[in-house]
């Protein structure tokens, strides 16, 4: 029987939110696309370090263990090509993350695939991609640095800041 997606929460996450791609992104910015591609392919067996959203994704996927069913699915959306994305998928396997669906967009913004994957939420570090997702009618959020480190407990916490009060300089 095919898996039904309408009875689960499907969250799309960008590869730069899931993993720390700052170093390789610097290569891209300073040396160009070919140097970036060579850099990623040469390191495809080296796991990437967890990114800003890694603890959140890990906890969301652990909900399935607690609930005894697949109630949450995380889908990866990436600007990487399939070749450079191999390092990302190898990192997913290294950390035993249950992520099996992905779109590698070859440099294009991945927001176009949100509806095709049946996602109800899109999380990214890229504010422009988040705006496009919102324009498509999908809930989306730009992830901001927590600067608080990784949480060691199993609690899952969200803070929504629709009017930019919580995370602005004016918050006291």
List the model feature ranges, each with a label:
Residues 2-4, 50-53, 68-70, 111-123, ...:
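Short, low-complexity cationic-aromatic patches
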Residues 56-89, 164:
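Substrate-recognition element of Asp-dependent hydrolases with the DxDx(T/V) motif
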């Amino acid at each position: 029987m095919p898996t039904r997606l309408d009875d689960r929460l499907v969250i799309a996450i960008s590869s730069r939110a899931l993993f720390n791609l700052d170093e390789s992104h610097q290569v891209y910015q300073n040396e160009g696309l070919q140097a970036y591609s060579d850099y990623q392919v040469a390191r495809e067996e080296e796991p990437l370090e967890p990114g800003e959203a890694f603890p959140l994704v890990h906890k969301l996927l652990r909900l399935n263990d607690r609930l005894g069913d697949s109630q949450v699915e995380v889908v990866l959306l990436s600007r990487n090509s399939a070749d450079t994305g191999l390092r990302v998928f190898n990192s997913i396997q290294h950390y035993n993350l249950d992520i099996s669906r992905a779109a590698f967009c070859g440099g294009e913004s991945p927001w176009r695939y949100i509806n095709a994957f049946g996602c109800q939420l899109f999380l990214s570090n890229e504010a422009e991609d988040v705006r496009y997702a919102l324009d498509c009618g999908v809930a989306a959020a730009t992830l901001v640095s927590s600067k608080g480190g990784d949480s060691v407990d199993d609690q899952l916490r969200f803070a929504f800041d629709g009017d930019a009060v919580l995370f602005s300089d004016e918050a006291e």
